[in-house]
Amino acid sequence: DKESSKEDQAYAEKLLKSVGSQAGKLQVSVSPVSRQPYKVWPAQHFAKLSDWLIESQGAQLYFLYGPGEEHFIESVKKEMNNDPMPDVGIPDLLQTRALLGKMDIHFGNDNGLRHLAIAAGIPTLGIFGKPSAVSWTPPGPTQHRSVEYDPGCKQSCTYPECEHLSCIRDVPVDEVHQALKKLLNDHVL
């Protein structure tokens, strides 16, 4: 990440070292958070893919979130069979951008952390509910990918009256898994 200040980069390096980050291991940031229910993919799905990253890729996983969003992380951790890296807390935005610049890949819900990961220049995979992925995924380079599902009502969505939120809850785990594998193979491994 060439755009972060030397101070922010030093902070990120010190933070990663303090939680046991190991050079040569796949570094993955995961953000299963959003304050909008139509952007929250189920915790058990994040847990399944997080376990896969740890077990089959030897990844070191860092859950990132903002103030008041810890409960999203705890919900995912409860469903996991493996331990992610220790919590890195809530750095400020510039420190978070520097931290993301140290990651190999980012995956998560459509949220601000994904935008920071894109700005940090790392490959991203976004999981989209109500908003159209094409509106929020940078055009061109394939290092930023997205997965979405349309149950037939995305264009005419009546949220908050919508009670099923199928557009995010039913995004297929296997489809996200395949997109994550392809992104890793194309840009990281």
Residue ranges and their predicted role:
Residues D1-Y38:
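Mid-sequence helix-capping/hinge segment at a functional interface
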Residues K6, A43, D170-D174:
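Electropositive phosphate-/nucleotide-binding environments in soluble metabolic enzymes
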Residues A23, G101, T142:
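Structured loop/turn residues at beta-strand edges in well-structured enzyme cores
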Residues Q36-P37, E70-H71, A133-V134, C153:
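Flexible, glycine-rich phosphate/dinucleotide-binding loops
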Residues P42-G129:
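Donor-binding and catalytic core of enzymes assembling or modifying cell-surface/extracellular glycoconjugates
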Residues D87, H115-L189:
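Nucleotide-sugar donor-binding patch of glycosyltransferase catalytic domains
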